């Protein structure tokens, strides 16, 4: 079945993202390492959406909006740098650093932003820190900061932006004592 006016490749991309999220949520006890990120990209680019999905790119790539070009990815270097990032104690900082490292590294032929966002969210969810989600109205700002990050390799500004604007989760508020007692009374009624 197709959707009128939507390209098949777009439908495949959305379906692949769904499967990538399923994979990420099923793997919450696994380390965020090179192998994991390759598997995420394989999910993102599966069904022939991305050539060589899940494998390091072996050709140069260009980035839209900048003349900066990422170097060729080297597996041993990536493994070492990811292990260093994995040592960051604060899970939110670790997640944002991992996401930004991966998006700038451009390990794959395509799907690097989706893959890096999923890897960052994997760390966030595993640490109980919510999720990273760039609101649609902030996407132009995010893309501008991303280009500056590509060119400078300084993640300070974009990390602060993500931290302040792009982390969602449940906010637990402290209930006043009367409301808490009332809630306990309601629960006792169900025990009968």
Segments and roles (model prediction):
Residues 1-192:
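FIC/Doc superfamily catalytic core
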């Amino acid at each position: 079945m197709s959707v009128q006016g939507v390209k098949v490749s777009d439908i495949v991309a959305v379906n692949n993202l769904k499967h990538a999220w399923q994979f990420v949520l099923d793997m919450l006890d696994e380390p965020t390492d090179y192998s994991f990120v390759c598997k995420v990209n394989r999910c993102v680019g599966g069904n022939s959406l991305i050539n060589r999905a899940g494998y390091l790119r072996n050709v140069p790539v260009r980035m839209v909006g900048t003349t900066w070009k990422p170097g060729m990815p080297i597996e041993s270097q990536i493994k070492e740098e990811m292990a260093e990032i994995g040592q960051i104690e604060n899970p939110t900082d670790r997640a944002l650093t991992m996401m930004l490292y991966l998006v700038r590294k451009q390990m794959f032929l395509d799907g690097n932003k989706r893959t890096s966002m999923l890897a960052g969210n994997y760390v966030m969810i595993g640490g109980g820190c919510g999720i990273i989600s760039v609101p649609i109205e902030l996407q132009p700002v995010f893309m501008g900061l991303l280009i500056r990050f590509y060119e400078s390799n300084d993640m300070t500004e974009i990390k602060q932006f993500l931290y302040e604007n792009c982390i969602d989760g449940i906010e637990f508020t402290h209930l006043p004592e009367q409301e808490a007692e009332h809630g306990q009374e309601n629960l006792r009624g169900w025990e009968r």
